[in-house]
Design a protein with these regions (language model features):
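Short amphipathic alpha-helix with an adjacent loop that forms part of the alpha/beta core around
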Residues: 50-56
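Conserved Class I S-adenosyl-L-methionine
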Residues: 136-199
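A conserved beta-strand element that flanks and buttresses the S-adenosyl-L-methionine
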Residues: 62
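A short glycine-rich, Lys/Arg-flanked "PGG" loop and its adjoining helix->strand segment in the class I
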Residues: 76-88
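Short alpha-helix
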Residues: 118-132
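Short catalytic micro-motifs in class I SAM-dependent methyltransferases
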Residues: 65-66
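Class I SAM-dependent methyltransferase SAM/SAH-binding core
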Residues: 2, 7-50
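Conserved class I S-adenosyl-L-methionine
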Residues: 93-119
């Protein structure tokens, strides 16, 4: 299993434990997080470089909320290269926030940037659907309940790629907004789009 944009590797590590995988999943991320999961083989590299060099093939290649960080040409290259690295019956699964229905709690600047990012995601999905007409599309809705204190910590750690380019002052100002805008407990629906490309 290969996880592109694995972050700290917690999701793929949990999946690995639940599915009792024979091999440790490989996680790629351009951010070298300190608190990475020990249950994955972490590589601090970009996907295009890794895929073009690796001799490994995979049953599953997971691309989570990362596609918007690439240019259209890079997406075409990445998906084509990923498809060539799939085992028989292998799958590429692209997970991203639903670009049309999004309830993530945000501060003003975060919302503005997220909206721009999701708009771009929609154009990317259209491109992927055009290039892979047999693609399977699924939607998932997760009910999220989280304390405001915990959510503030997540924002401080820049849990979503939209926050990565923000400076310390922008984050600090945003946290003041979050503190004033939301109740002690945040409840929202996390809506994900899942695109599945089969080998």
């Amino acid at each position: 299993v290969l996880d592109i944009g694995c972050g700290r590797g917690k999701i793929i590590a949990n999946l690995s434990s639940k599915l009792n995988l024979h091999y440790k999943p490989i996680g790629l991320d351009i951010e070298n997080h300190k608190d990475k999961s020990k249950k994955i083989i972490f590589k601090n590299t970009d996907a295009l470089s890794f895929i073009s060099k690796t001799k490994l093939n995979f049953d599953l290649i997971l691309i989570k909320q990362t596609i918007h960080l690439l240019k259209k040409k890079e997406i075409k290259t990445l998906l084509s290269n990923c498809k060539s690295k799939l085992n028989v019956n292998g799958k590429i699964i692209i997970l991203s926030l639903d670009p049309e229905k999004n309830e993530i709690p945000t501060f003003f600047l975060m919302k503005k940037k997220l909206h721009k990012s999701l708009k771009r995601d929609k154009s990317y999905f259209d491109l992927i659907k055009k290039n892979y007409p047999k693609i399977i599309i699924k939607q998932f809705i997760f009910k999220v309940k989280i304390s405001k204190i915990k959510y503030i910590q997540m924002i401080k750690k820049r849990y979503i790629s939209t926050l990565l380019s923000f400076n310390e002052k922008q984050i600090a100002d945003g946290l003041i907004e979050i503190k004033n805008k939301y109740k002690k407990e945040l409840k929202f629906k996390d809506r994900l789009i899942c695109l599945i490309i089969r080998n």
